[in-house]
Amino acid sequence: MEIRWLGHACFTITHNGYTLVIDPYHSDYVTGYPKLRGVKADKLLISHDSYGHNYREGVVLSGRPESDCPFSITPMEVWHDTVCGIMRGSCLVHLIEADGIRAAHLGDIGAPLTGEQAGKLYNLDAMMVTAGSCTALPSQEVFRLTEELFPRVIIPMHYRDGNRGPRRLEHVEELTKHYAPDMVKIYDTDRITITCDMEPQIAVLRFQGLPPEPPAAPGKKASTLSRISSKMPFFRRR
């Protein structure tokens, strides 16, 4: 299973030639990143409807039938805040499994898991989790969560990366400082291949740009309405 980080909380997850994309972002609201355009995938997953996570227009789906999907995908509803959703509602954690590999994308999780949810997410091969923010769990709570769930590979996401990402997010070092230094592995690439026997680690991937945009169909232009609506700030939560 290959996991590629496209910035913020967006990843592609590929297995046996089939690709999921999760949480595509609108660059008007996740500043510093280039605009997502024409990211190719076979299936789209979204943790919650905010512009930092739901930019469907940036994804081109293949149209392959569900029967082609090699993944078992289990969504779990969690709170996006510490007050039972009063401030930010809920979001989805996605448990993604294929050929014995278990990975999870925790979205903007903002509160502890239930016992049942924790049981389903225990001892994952890979966990994509926020590095800490005021709109999700802070870094100290993320560390406690990973200590409880014991994932083999922790992939930080949703953090301030240089001049990329919302300023209110924490930097990745605010999370990695809680772990032994020899556990933290800084990658020179934006992707990692997950296996059942890889060494435990905090895998900090490096943003390396976005996939090239596919060429537009000859003579086809976006309508004025679609161009305007893509910029309208209906929902600003990240």
Predicted regions mapped to residue ranges:
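Active-site-proximal beta-strand elements of phosphoester/diester hydrolases
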Residues: 2-5, 19-23, 72-78, 93-95, ...
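Pre-active-site segment of Zn-dependent metallo-hydrolases
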Residues: 10-46, 50-64, 74-89, 109-120
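A short helix->loop->beta-strand "cap" motif at the edges of active sites that frequently abuts
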Residues: 18, 149-153
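Conserved acidic residues
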Residues: 42, 125, 152
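Metallo-beta-lactamase
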Residues: 52-100, 180-199
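Active-site-proximal loop/helix segments of hydrolase catalytic cores
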Residues: 83-149
